[in-house]
Swiss-Prot record:
Protein name per the record: FMN-dependent NADH:quinone oxidoreductase
Pfam families named among the record's database cross-references: Flavodoxin_2 (PF02525)
Organism for this UniProt entry: Streptomyces avermitilis (strain ATCC 31267 / DSM 46492 / JCM 5070 / NBRC 14893 / NCIMB 12804 / NRRL 8165 / MA-4680)
InterPro entries found in the cross-reference section: Flavodoxin_fold, Flavoprotein-like_sf, FMN-dep_NADH:Q_OxRdtase_AzoR1, NADH:quinone_OxRdtase_FMN_depd
Protein family (similarity comment): Belongs to the azoreductase type 1 family.
Length: 217
């Protein structure tokens, strides 16, 4: 049975979070195709993973037999997160834009799972080629040609780490202009925001079914 690793990082509940809501659409469509499959779920806002410490970092480059008690404890946490990623047939990540970047909790998760010689810089990595769908929501628009394009650090960063470093098969779904309904200065953009959100839900369902069919074959 196929395994989906689902990561949420928004600080808001689904009713107030585009990334969570669209990710739910993806997950629901996936589970309809794989009712007996496994979903590994991590809510990084409710249960943050540890930030990388010196012990966690150095343990990744040392023989486990030589680990200090501090290194062993810190690396055990990394090992758990890496094992979940290696187990996944597909990955789903909710990545809202906060102050032009990803939430710090998501950065902490990435710092834990990127391990040189295992998940990165390893031609035999178990995660290479794993499809990852990122719901990259944002309050405005940072699309090519817009005034804020130079401030788009979410997709650019995640491409570097997920695709270039980890070798995952990356696709973005981008619900944008999510603040239009709450900011009077953006009121004229509400129709565009609604269209963007509707398309994001449609794309999420379609992508989930596409991947589910791939692993059912």
């Amino acid at each position: 049975m196929a395994t989906l690793l689902h990561i949420d990082s928004s600080v808001f509940p689904s009713a107030a979070s585009a990334s969570r809501a669209v990710a739910e659409t993806f997950r629901t469509a996936w589970q309809e195709q794989h009712p007996d499959g496994t979903v590994i779920y991590r809510d990084l806002s409710a249960n943050p993973v540890p930030h990388i410490t010196a012990d966690a970092h150095t343990a990744g480059f040392a023989d486990p037999a030589t680990h200090t008690p501090g290194q062993a404890a810190a690396f055990a946490e990394r090992e758990k997160l890496i094992a979940e990623l290696e187990q996944a047939d597909a990955v789903l990540i909710g990545a809202p834009m906060y102050n032009y970047a990803i939430p710090s909790t998501l950065k902490a998760w990435l710092d834990n799972v990127i391990l040189m010689g295992r998940t990165a810089a390893n031609e035999n990595s178990k995660v290479t080629g794993t499809p990852v769908t990122v719901i990259a929501s944002r309050g405005g628009s940072y699309a090519p040609g817009t005034p804020r394009e130079p401030y788009e650090y979410v997709q650019n960063y995640l491409k570097a780490v997920l695709s270039d470093a980890l070798g995952l098969e990356l696709e973005f779904i981008v619900p944008e202009l999510t603040m239009a309904a709450h900011n009077p200065a953006m009121s004229e953009l509400v129709p565009l925001a609604e269209a963007s959100r509707a398309k994001a839900h449609e794309d999420a369902a379609a992508k989930a079914k596409e991947l589910a069919d791939r692993f059912a074959a």
